[in-house]
Amino acid sequence: KLTSKPISAVASEILTPEQMEMYQVYRQTMGNKPLLFGGGSPDMSNSEDLTGVQFVNGTRPGNPQLVELAKRQVGNVGGYPYWSWYGFDSRVEWCACFVSWCYNQAGKSEPRFAGCEWQGVPWFQSHGQWGARGYNNLAPGDAIFFDWDLDGTADHVGIVIGTDGSRVYTVEGNSGDACKIKSYDLNYQSIKGYGLMNW
C-alpha cells in the first residue's frame, strides 16, 4: 500500500540537522536557485589591472592580509575549494562561498553564507554592519553586494580591495565562473550595498 507524505515530513525524518538547515533556506527561497545562491556574475571579461590605482580608503580599519589572500585566488575557475569547504558536494553558484572562505581563512568564523539575499545581507544588517550604495567609509575586506537586475534582491557578492575616490575595486568569485579583480563607479546602480567588516 502506498502512502503519501508531504516532503517536509520526509525531510525531518531523513536529513541531518545541517541538511535540514539548508533545506529550510531552500524552502524560504521557493527553490529559486538565483535567490538561494546568488546568480554570480555573467561577466566574461578579464581581470582588471591595479597598476597605478591610488587607493584613498576611509577611516575604518580594514584587513589588507585578507585582500592579499583574496587576490591570490584570481584565476581560479569553477570555485573549488570554496563551495566544497562550505559543505556542498558539487559546484553551486559560489560567489558567497568564496567570500565566506576568505573570511574564514582570515580568522573570522562569521559571517558564513552561501546565499547573498537570504543569508549574507541579513547577517550584516542584523549586526548593524550594513552600508547602502553611496556609503563612503569603505575598508579593505568589506563585502560588496550587487543587484544586477535591479529587483531589490542581492544577486552577487565580492570583497572590497579599496576605492580611489570614484571607483570601488573588488575581488569576486564566480565572475564568469572565475575569481577576478573588477571595478565599478561608486554610484553604479547595481551596487546594493556593503557588508562592513569589523577587524
Regions found by a protein language model. Name each.
Residues P42-Q54, G131-R133, L150, A154-W199:
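Aromatic- and glycine-rich peptidoglycan recognition patches
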Residues L2, P6, V10, E21, ...:
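Extracytoplasmic/secreted proteins, especially bacterial periplasmic and envelope-associated proteins
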Residues G78-P140, D151:
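Catalytic cysteine-centered active-site loop
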Residues K1-P42:
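Charge-rich (acidic/polar
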Residues S41-K108:
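N-terminal capping segments
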